[in-house]
Amino acid sequence: MIETYNQPVPRSAATGPPVSMKIFMYLLTVFLITQMIGSALFAVYLHRRLDKIEDERNLHEDFVFMKTIQRCNTGERSLSLLNCEEIKSQFEGFVKDIMLNKEEKKKENSFEMQKGDQNPQIAAHVISEASSKTTSVLQWAEKGYYTMSNNLVTLENGKQLTVKRQGLYYIYAQVTFCSNREASSQAPFIASLCLKPPNRFERILLRAANTHSSAKPCGQQSIHLGGIFELQPGASVFVNVTDPSQVSHGTGFTSFGLLKL
C-alpha cells in the first residue's frame, strides 16, 4: 500500500497596507493641515475686516449726524422740530464736553507752571577767596565751578549767602587748612557755620574743631560742616574760622553752599 505525503502549504508572510492606502492617508493629512492653516488665515482676515467695517460704520454715523445738524440749521421740512432740537442738544453736549476737557488741561498746565514759579530751585556753591586770610569770616567768590541758581540767593559782600525765600535749606561748608604751628600754640583750629537772621543777632549753627599737625612744611586737614535749617527771607549764613591764615584756597579745598529742599 503506497502512502502519499502532501507537504503543508506555507503561510504567506504578513504584508503592510497597500500603497494606495498610504497615499490616501498622506493626502488626508495634507488636506487637514491645509484646512487648519486656511481656517486660521480666514479668521484673521475676518477679524480685521469686521474692525474695518465697524470703523466705517462709526464714520458713517458721524457723517450722518453732522449732515442732520446741517439740515436742521438750514430748516429743511423733512425733519421734525422735535428731532432737530434733540440732535442740537446732543451736539451742544458734545461740544461742551470737549471745551471742558480743554479748560481742565489748561488749568492743569497753568497750575504746574505756577507751582514751578512758587517753588523755584534755589542753590548756591561758591569758592574761597585768598583775600580772606586777614579776617576770621571767610570770603567767597563766584569763580571756577560755582553755582548761583537765580536772584533768590545772593552773595553779599563776598562773605555771606543771603536767601530771599523762606524754607528748609541744606547748608554745607568744607574748610581745608594747613596746621603747622609751633608746639607752644596748640589751640585747635575751629570752623563755625553761622546764621544772621534779619534784625536779630547772629548765632552759631554748627561748629567743628581739628588739632594741629606737626608735619613740615604743611599738613593738610579738612573740616566738613553740613545740616538742614529753616531760613527766613533775608537770612544770611557765613563761615567763621579761628585762624584764617591757615586756610588753604587751592582748587576744591575750601567751598561753601546751600540748597533749598
UniProtKB/Swiss-Prot annotation:
SUPFAM superfamilies per the UniProt record, alphabetical: TNF-like
GO BP terms in the entry: B cell proliferation; immune response; inflammatory response; platelet activation; positive regulation of interleukin-10 production; positive regulation of interleukin-4 production; positive regulation of NF-kappaB transcription factor activity; positive regulation of T cell proliferation
Similarity comment: family membership: Belongs to the tumor necrosis factor family.
Protein name (database record): CD40 ligand
GO molecular function terms listed in the Swiss-Prot or TrEMBL record: CD40 receptor binding; cytokine activity; protein serine/threonine kinase activator activity; tumor necrosis factor receptor binding
Domain of life, per lineage: Eukaryota
PTMs per UniProt: The soluble form derives from the membrane form by proteolytic processing.
One GO cellular component term: plasma membrane
SMART domains: TNF
Domain THD: 122-261
Native organism taxonomy: Eukaryota, Metazoa, Chordata, Craniata, Vertebrata
Function, in words: Cytokine that acts as a ligand to CD40/TNFRSF5. Costimulates T-cell proliferation and cytokine production. Its cross-linking on T-cells generates a costimulatory signal which enhances the production of IL4 and IL10 in conjunction with the TCR/CD3 ligation and CD28 costimulation. Induces the activation of NF-kappa-B. Induces the activation of kinases MAPK8 and PAK2 in T-cells. Mediates B-cell proliferation in the absence of co-stimulus as well as IgE production in the presence of IL4. Involved in immunoglobulin class switching.
Keywords: Cell membrane, Cytokine, Disulfide bond, Glycoprotein, Membrane, Secreted, Signal-anchor, Transmembrane, Transmembrane helix
UniProt topological domain (Extracellular) ranges: 44-261
Spans within the Cytoplasmic topological domain: 1-22
Keyword match Secreted: yes
Species: Callithrix jacchus (White-tufted-ear marmoset)
Predominant localisation class: membrane
Gene: CD40LG
PANTHER family in the cross-refs: CD40 LIGAND, TUMOR NECROSIS FACTOR FAMILY MEMBER
Segments crossing the lipid bilayer: 23-43
